[in-house]
Amino acid sequence: MGSSLSLAVPPGPLSFEALLAQVGALGGGQQLQLGLCCLPVLFVALGLASDPIFTLAPPLHCHYGAFPPNASGWEQPPNASGVSVASAALAASAASRLATSTDPSCSGFAPPDFNHCLKDWDYNGLPVLTTNAIGQWDLVCDLGWQVILEQILFILGFASGYLFLGYPADRFGRRGIVLLTLGLVGPCGVGGAAAGSSTGVMALRFLLGFLLAGVDLGVYLMRLELCDPTQRLRVALAGELVGVGGHFLFLGLALVSKDWRFLQRMITAPCILFLFYGWPGLFLESARWLIVKRQIEEAQSVLRILAERNRPHGQMLGEEAQEALQDLENTCPLPATSSFSFASLLNYRNIWKNLLILGFTNFIAHAIRHCYQPVGGGGSPSDFYLCSLLASGTAALACVFLGVTVDRFGRRGILLLSMTLTGIASLALLGLWDYLNEAAITTFSVLGLFSSQAAGILSTLLAAEVIPTTVRGRGLGLIMALGALGGLSGPAQRLHMGHGAFLQHVVLAACALLCILSIMLLPETKRKLLPEVLRDGELCRRPSLLQQPPPNRCDHVPLLATPNPAL
């Protein structure tokens, strides 16, 4: 009977990653596509870096003149009685000094019994630009709330874009969302630079954040879905490093331009050139998404273009690649997707558990950064440069740290370490602030900023790896929207003029400790295939600590057992 009766087990369906290798799509063509997906991240970073500078409050100085009875240039409130000679002299002395306070209520430098500057404000002293939106419309003192409102609306624009553009990315494709939002970023940015009122600027900045979020989400999905398991981390970190480079580039552009309107046009108008991405065969749709959506002909075309880019000009594809493309539906079979109702999605409890944990972790990682480094934390130019370079530098170091450790120790372990370091830094600053010298406080602040940056990057990557392709746009959009909402901690703190900062830090530190416990419930995705459908995503779970692993399937009974002579 021997080998002639041995049963050949039919090979299972190929995964998408194996299909890429079989077709020959991994190589130069894939790297070109990944590079095209990373380039828009530069302009997303430029847009993010612009808001702190455009809304940076300059040191205030009221122009004063010699007109009685107010020799200081400040106006008395209506309910004030007369001004004595001593009061007028005191007011003139106070106003003659250059005020360095940036308190939006102006209470830090207004003379006694005076609250309005009769003449123009002097906004000299900005670290980078000669003037910004604050100086354009005198958004100080009683109008200072408009600056905080603009910051909140810009962040809400990003959160709304991540949240609401995920569904179109799943329904109509990643490429269409990227092209549409990139094409609208240029006109929106130029329109914001030409706005004639602060209200128009706020509305267009909200829309700009909405569009930039769509770009960021779309290209993140396209980069991730084109990689095999060994490439995903490197590609994700490459996109983050491009974003860090965008922050450094923005400082250079701001030093050159000096005018905030010209700078706004400079960082948004070039996005119109991305319309060339619509050229057929240049910027390709995600082949993984096309297969899941059962658009087989389009998927064959995309894979063929990627494979042909890796071959010398004129050389035909191999026979194995041709057969795999022609029989794509049977080579890589995936269930056809359908429209999912919210009620049906509630049945997949493990997917929701992963979303809840990673969304909460991403929110805390972004919210707690303000406790280590306020945006534009100092009033002097040197303080602003230090804060900006510190934020960008720690983000770059976080990328290097993740690139060295994550593939060796796993996503979940390094995420747990990052949140642990974040909690340690917060507890040290909260409990030992009065006992630490300046060097120790700076060290713990840098540690907290570095670890929170690493936790935010890794939680986004881990979320993209556990969410199925069928709902990856919506799921990842939710995670990134929660991260954007975490950035509201800074404007919220400035809205209350610093009151309650200690309590806010205590709450966020406690939430960081809660994240440490919840991260242990996440699955490990290192070198694993991406889930394609909801059933695959439901299987992404951490093995139970109490349940023993199933024994290896081993047949201990020989096929041709010899009888025992003793019987």
UniProtKB/Swiss-Prot annotation:
Residues 545-567 are annotated as: Disordered. The keyword Nucleus does not apply. Coiled coil: none annotated. GO terms for biological process: siderophore transport. GO terms for molecular function: transmembrane signaling receptor activity; transmembrane transporter activity. It is a multi-pass membrane protein. Keywords: Cell membrane, Glycoprotein, Ion transport, Iron, Iron transport, Membrane, Receptor, Transmembrane, Transmembrane helix, Transport, Vacuole. InterPro entries: MFS_dom, MFS_sugar_transport-like, MFS_trans_sf, Sugar_transporter_CS. Its main location: membrane. It is found in: Cell membrane; Vacuole membrane. PROSITE patterns: MFS (PS50850), SUGAR_TRANSPORT_1 (PS00216). Pfam families: Sugar_tr. Glycans are attached at residues 70, 79. It comes from the Eukaryota. The chain crosses the membrane at residues 147-167, 176-196, 201-221, 235-255, 266-286, 350-369, 384-404, 413-433, 444-464, 475-495, 502-522. One of its GO terms (cellular component) is vacuolar membrane. Gene3D superfamilies: MFS general substrate transporter like domains (1.20.1250.20). Belongs to the major facilitator (TC 2.A.1) superfamily. Organic cation transporter (TC 2.A.1.19) family. Cell surface receptor for LCN2 (24p3) that plays a key role in iron homeostasis and transport. Able to bind iron-bound LCN2 (holo-24p3), followed by internalization of holo-24p3 and release of iron, thereby increasing intracellular iron concentration and leading to inhibition of apoptosis. Also binds iron-free LCN2 (apo-24p3), followed by internalization of apo-24p3 and its association with an intracellular siderophore, leading to iron chelation and iron transfer to the extracellular medium, thereby reducing intracellular iron concentration and resulting in apoptosis. This is Solute carrier family 22 member 17. It comes from Bos taurus.
